Amino acid sequence: MERHQHLLSEYQQILTLSEQMLVLATEGNWDALVDLEMTYLKAVESTANITISSCSSLMLQDLLREKLRAILDNEIEIKRLLQLRLDRLSDLVGQSTKQQAVNNTYGQFPDHALLLGETQ
């Protein structure tokens, strides 16, 4: 029974961490999300070392199934939010590259040639 409590506690910790990560992703707090992800991954690794086959209780399996479903739902939403962020960053890099090309092209001319109304 103690083993079952420990396993349930491990899954609850993962669920709590995934909920915190989802909040951070929703808020766009990417640095804190990355920091928390290390703790999350360690918790997942620790839980993976506990064998689920040792849970013979159907009630415990149902509880774990619910937690796993919620964890996976959070993972899907976090990935969606991260993809949106990646797309936004990609757009910004594209705009920056275009701006740099424009600056490089027009930077070749003397400053006075760019002023309107001046004759050369």
Swiss-Prot record:
Principal subcellular localisation of the protein: cytoplasm
HAMAP family for this protein: FliT
GO cellular component: cytosol
Domain of life (superkingdom): Bacteria
Family: Belongs to the FliT family.
The species this protein was found in: Yersinia enterocolitica serotype O:8 / biotype 1B (strain NCTC 13174 / 8081)
Lineage: Bacteria, Pseudomonadati, Pseudomonadota, Gammaproteobacteria, Enterobacterales
Gene that this sequence comes from: fliT
Sequence segments annotated as region (FliD binding): 60-98
Pfam families xref list: FliT
Protein name listed in UniProt: Flagellar protein FliT
Primary role: Dual-function protein that regulates the transcription of class 2 flagellar operons and that also acts as an export chaperone for the filament-capping protein FliD. As a transcriptional regulator, acts as an anti-FlhDC factor; it directly binds FlhC, thus inhibiting the binding of the FlhC/FlhD complex to class 2 promoters, resulting in decreased expression of class 2 flagellar operons. As a chaperone, effects FliD transition to the membrane by preventing its premature polymerization, and by directing it to the export apparatus.
Keywords in alphabetical order: Bacterial flagellum biogenesis, Chaperone, Cytoplasm, Repressor, Transcription, Transcription regulation
